[in-house]
Amino acid sequence: MRILISNDDGVTAPGLAALYAALADYTECVVIAPEQDKSGASSSLTLDRPLHPQYLANGFISLNGTPTDCVHLGLNGLLEREPDMVVSGINLGANLGDDVLYSGTVAAALEGRFLKRPSFAFSLVSRQVDNLPTAAYFARKLVEAHAGLDLPPRTVLNVNIPNLPIDHIRGIQLTRLGHRARAAAPMKVVDPRGKAGYWIAAAGDAEDGGPGTDFHAVMQGYVSITPLQLDRTFNDAFRSLDGWLEGLN
């Protein structure tokens, strides 16, 4: 099996190195990652300029693009042999609930949806590196164990690991996405010439974070696994919309 590894924190990120180290002695791995931090890039593709891969001394491939660019090229001709699976991470910071809409880590995994095996997105619920070994351990454990899975095509597994030592993790839970409250207002700054700018504020706290959600699992010390799909159709709205459209036709 050949795994394509990517991330959104950039090719020099410690989480990427930890993920590669955890998986490379298990199976063949190739790394294609953004040359700089692309957190929050979601599923954006670069369409206004060419992409130039750089082959680094450690064997990684650096790309002047987004996480989705990296996986897209990796699956469509940049590599001599197509990977069997895409694994993204390890992100420093949670990708819980609404975060998946913006996350480049999750987007990289979603770009691997056409492969026959499920893609994984791994995130450590911390900006600090102290418990990266915990996240790397569970990444290896879950990727190794995936062979017995019988999942629908185009399934992506979003995994969040609590910021705890390995022996403090209580287990692994299957969860749904929770929801965050609305983010705080952007922070306005004014430069010395009087020109206004804005910093995007931090994400909102968990608004729907009760039992069964990814938020609740990690707060209780469990690794959270949430299966994601690309189809965002809101089926519960069909009945209301059917009646509404009848009056318009």
From Swiss-Prot:
GO terms for cellular component: cytoplasm. Its EC number is 3.1.3.5. SUPFAM superfamilies: SurE-like. Pfam families: SurE. Its main location: cytoplasm. A divalent metal cation binds at residues 8-9, 39, 91. It comes from the Bacteria. Keywords: Cytoplasm, Hydrolase, Metal-binding, Nucleotide-binding. Nucleotidase that shows phosphatase activity on nucleoside 5'-monophosphates. Belongs to the SurE nucleotidase family. This is 5'-nucleotidase SurE.
